[in-house]
Each structure stands twice: as structure tokens, then as C-alpha cells.
Amino acid sequence: MCAAEVDRHVSQRYLIKRRLGKGAYGIVWKAMDRRTGEVVAIKKIFDAFRDQTDAQRTFREIMLLREFGGHPNIIRLLDVIPAKNDRDIYLVFESMDTDLNAVIQKGRLLEDIHKRCIFYQLLRATKFIHSGRVIHRDQKPANVLLDAACRVKLCDFGLARSLSDFPEGPGGQALTEYVATRWYRAPEVLLSSRWYTPGVDMWSLGCILGEMLRGQPLFPGTSTFHQLELILETIPLPSMEELQGLGSDYSALILQNLGSRPRQTLDALLPPDTPPEALDLLKRLLAFAPDKRLSAEQALQHPYVQRFHCPDREWTRGSDVRLPVHEGDQLSAPEYRNRLYQMILERRRNSRSPREEDLGVVASRAELRASQRQSLKPGVLPQVLAETPARKRGPKPQNGHGHDPEHVEVRRQSSDPLYQLPPPGSGERPPGATGEPPSAPSGVKTHVRAVAPSLTSQAAAQAANQPLIRSDPARGGGPRAVGARRVPSRLPREAPEPRPGRRMFGISVSQGAQGAARAALGGYSQAYGTVCRSALGRLPLLPGPRA
């Protein structure tokens, strides 16, 4: 690792272990928090505010992760650290072992139970997002992270949009641009429909399910026209009413040219041993008309994931998500950066631990306590990820029907970062932001303090905070870590780490599934790289924090 790649104030806080991947727009490292011993993934985004598009995407992703990060199937953003050059930015995430794209590419590593388990967790995350009237718009295997216990974390919210900020039309909300990966785009997106609904995510989930069942993408189109061609050769042709409902100006002309081509059935694309309930769910998700696709809540009740279904653990938000800056307000890149840095400085002054009451989810305290006591059943560990010790078998929770299926349960972890993102629904926003603030739970006060918006003053404040310690006059003037619990100053003893014999991680390996969209839009990938099977077996288990 080149020392110049990591700013000094970042390396003082996190011990960089190794680089997981590098692309044109960023680097991802595996690291360890020097204070807590927690293993994390640090993503450095190059020129995160190079233009209005990238600045808005960075701002949007951080704000949405703030809203959704309390869900067990959505990646947790632990820390946001501005770079010294005032252009790059560091995002610190919880560490995951691999992504679904890498696992599928290895071939025959997932048993039927693993596929059901993974898809159930994806549906659970999607239901939570949609309950806040947000659509992800970029669900694909590379954005589905996995760990050794087969736990799923949905990531990369840079293209997500809040439907609350857009006018509603006859078929949904009006969105102006869409640049997600082509292979997972819904027909209404390919046909430039003027109205989008949560159905675009359900189509993407259908494509992900089909790819897990088939072992390769269902519709690997090389162009928009070819993508439509592959889709309409497989699913039932739409009716005239369904075409008119899309609100597309030229959908009828395109479909007229494609409707006479030879056809094939969806089950012909899948292996002969595909479970009948999997095929049925796939057909219900890959319906041409968005309003005829299953919703996430309906799909959770489908027989394919019935053994995991437990309504008390399938959370919903109590209110819509509204970003601090209205989606319709186009700020300049420096304005997005200033707003974000103001919020970082404000959070550092008011660092506090998140409370369960602030999560903005409909879940009882008893269910939350039960979720902390249980973990994923060890019988569903995929062989490719079996690098951690097996967990003890816990009691199986009962569902509302009285029988005892296997359930997915993810233990919530705690962390004390210097910059603790506020809990969802805290209602806080930067000074001067337009639009409505997020709805706050009853009894939760919002705090908005004025911060000088100039970059000079912010840089000075940042430089003063770079050592990540401050003096505490009340405790005798000694240094203390802001927002962190006190732990012994001695670092956890590191286990010897074997040097890899070959290149283990590479962003380019999964480029086929990502398509050329990333290069075209000038964005960045949040994939954590591709992991080979032998490399996973050599990954050392880092010790946790000492008592």
C-alpha cells in the first residue's frame, strides 16, 4: 500500500490491513478500528464532488444510508471522513466478505436453501426501503454483499430516489434520468416511461433471482433494443392497455417490431431441477406491467421463502423519507460538499449513540431483544464463505401459523465512531437546506446549529480535529476520543497474516455483470471486489476489542 493513498488523519484512526480493490473512481481497503478492534471496509472516493452529478450522488447516498442503516439487511455506514485535499472523501462501512456476483460466478456454490435465504433477506430490505417511499433503482448481484454466515447487506444507494419529492402521475412518480445497469432494468425504464414505481426494484429482484437459479444473467442484452428483444422473447406479450399505461411515446412502435419474433418460455432458461415455487415467484416478479408485479410485502408471503417468513421481523418505516435537500433542487457541486461537511462538523459536536426508539421502524422492543440473542441458523452456511467458527444453534422462533420454520436473524452490532451518523428519523438537516426535514419520532428533538459555510473555516476546523482527540477540561485536560467509549490504549495483538499467493480481489472481474454503465455515467462502484474460494480460507480472524 502506498502511504500517499491514505490521509494521515485516517491512518491514525484505522489500521489499514490491505487493499481489496481499486478502480478509476476509488479504492477499497480492509482495515481495523484502532480503538475498538472492529474490522471495517474503507472506501475512498476520488473527486467525489467533481461535478454536480457525482456530488449529488455522494450526498444522496450518505443521507439515505443515514435513514436506512439501522436495518439488518442494509449496509451500515460507520463513519464519513473528509480528505485533506477537500476533494476526496472516505466512507467507512461494516466489513463484508464478498458479493453475490462473485459467488454466482464461482458456480454451484449456493444450495437451494442458500438461494432462498439470500432472496428472503433481499425482499426484507426492499420492503423496508419501499415503506419509506424510496426506490433503490440499482439492485444487482454486485450490490448484494454477503458474509460467512450468509447474511445479506444491500449497498450502493447512489441512484436511489425518494418518491415523496416528485409529482405523482397516472402510473407513479415522474423521474428524469436513469442510468442503472442494463441487464436489470425494467421494461418501462428501457422504454423511457415518464412514470416509475417501486415495481422497477421488483423487476430487478426477479432478474437477481433468475440469475441465482440459472447461474448466469437472464437477459444479458448488449444494447437497449437487444435487452427488450430478450425480454419480450421470454415473458408474455403485453396488452394494448398495458402499453398505454407505461406513458412511453414510442413503446407501441418498438413492441410492434419485436412482437413477431420467435418465443421461448421462462422455464426453458432455467435448470430442470428448478423448484416449482421458484419458477412461480419468478413469473410473478417478471410481469411486463408494473402494477401486476408482486410487491416486496406480497413476495415475502410467497411459498418460495415461506420457511423464513416472520412478519414481526419484516420491518417498515413509520414515515416517508425526505432528504435535507429536495430532489428537484439542483445545487452546485461546492454547495453539496458544503452541506455535507457542515453536517459532519455538527454531528461531531453532538456525537451520541443511536437509540432503538430512533430507528423509525415498526418493531417491538421484545422483538429487538430477541434479534440480539439469535443469529442465522448455522445450517445455511455456504461452503465458499465457511471461514468463521460455526455459531451455536439457538431456539427457532415461532411464526404466526404455529409451525417452526428456519428463520433468518441478523444480530445488530454496535459501534462508537467519531462521527456517528444520526439515527433515522432524527429530523436534523443542515442550515439553509430546502425541502422538508425527515419526520422525527415523537419525543425526539431536532438540533440545528449554524456553522460557517466557508470552505476556509471548515478546513481549519477539520485540521484542528484531524488528530481525532480533544482535550477535556472537566477530566483534567487530558486527551479524549470524541464519541467513543474508553478502552485500553494498547492495541489488540494482531495475528500473523499470510501473504496471498495471487491476486485475490479485482474490480474488473465483475465488470461483465456491471456493464458499461458505470464508465459512462462517471460514477463509482461500491462492490468490495471479487473473492476467490481459496483466498477466503486464508483470511485471518482478527481479535475483537479487549475488555
UniProtKB/Swiss-Prot annotation:
Briefly describe activity regulation: Activated by threonine and tyrosine phosphorylation. Inhibited by dual specificity phosphatases, such as DUSP1. Phosphorylation and activation in response to DNA damaging agents, serum stimulation. Constitutively activated when phosphorylated on Tyr-178. Activity depends on the relative rates of MAPK15 autophosphorylation and dephosphorylation by PTPN1.
Keyword presence, Signal: no
Q: Where do Low complexity bias regions lie? A: 481-490
Where is the stretch described as Requires for interaction with GABARAP, MAP1LC3B AND GABARAPL1? 301-380
Identify the main location. cytoplasm
Q: How is it modified after translation?
A: Autophosphorylated on Thr-176 and Tyr-178; activates the enzyme.
Per UniProt, the enzyme's principal EC class comes to: transferase
Q: Which InterPro entries match?
A: Kinase-like_dom_sf, MAP_kinase, MAP_kinase_CS, Prot_kinase_dom, Protein_kinase_ATP_BS
User: What EC number(s) does the entry state?
Assistant: 2.7.11.24
Gene3D superfamilies for the chain: Phosphorylase Kinase, domain 1 (3.30.200.20), Transferase(Phosphotransferase) domain 1 (1.10.510.10)
Region of interest (Ubiquitin-conjugating), ranges: 1-20
Gene Ontology CC entries for this record: autophagosome; bicellular tight junction; cell-cell junction; centriole; ciliary basal body; cytoplasm; cytoplasmic vesicle; Golgi apparatus
The reported effect of Y178F is:
Loss of autophosphorylation and activity. Loss of autophosphorylation and activity
Q: Where is this motif: TXY?
A: 176-178
- Superkingdom to which the source organism belongs: Eukaryota
Q: Which consequence is recorded for altering K43R?
A: Loss of autophosphorylation and activity
Q: Which residues carry this modification: Omega-N-methylarginine?
A: R449
Limits of the Protein kinase domain: 14-305
Give the quaternary structure. Answer: Interacts with CSK/c-Src, ABL1, RET and TGFB1I1. Interacts with GABARAP, MAP1LC3B and GABARAPL1; controls, in a kinase-dependent fashion, both basal and starvation-induced autophagy. Interacts with ESRRA; promotes re-localization of ESRRA to the cytoplasm through a XPO1-dependent mechanism then inhibits ESRRA transcriptional activity. Interacts with PCNA; the interaction is chromatin binding- and kinase activity-dependent and prevents MDM2-mediated PCNA destruction by inhibiting the association of PCNA with MDM2. Interacts with DVL2. Interacts with CLIC3; MAPK15 does not phosphorylates CLIC3.
- Give the family from UniProt: Belongs to the protein kinase superfamily. CMGC Ser/Thr protein kinase family. MAP kinase subfamily.
Instruction: Provide the domain comment.
Output: C-terminal domain, rather than the kinase activity, is required for the full function of the enzyme. This region may be a protein interaction domain that regulates kinase localization, activation and transcriptional activity. When C-terminally truncated, the enzyme shows a reduction in the Thr-Glu-Tyr (TEY) phosphorylation level, in the in vitro kinase activity, in its nuclear localization and in its inhibitory effect on cell growth. The N-terminal region (1-20) is the minimal region necessary for ubiquitination and further proteasomal degradation.
By its UniProt entry, which PANTHER family does this protein fall under? MITOGEN-ACTIVATED PROTEIN KINASE (PTHR24055)
Q: What is this protein called?
A: Mitogen-activated protein kinase 15
What species was this sequence derived from? Rattus norvegicus
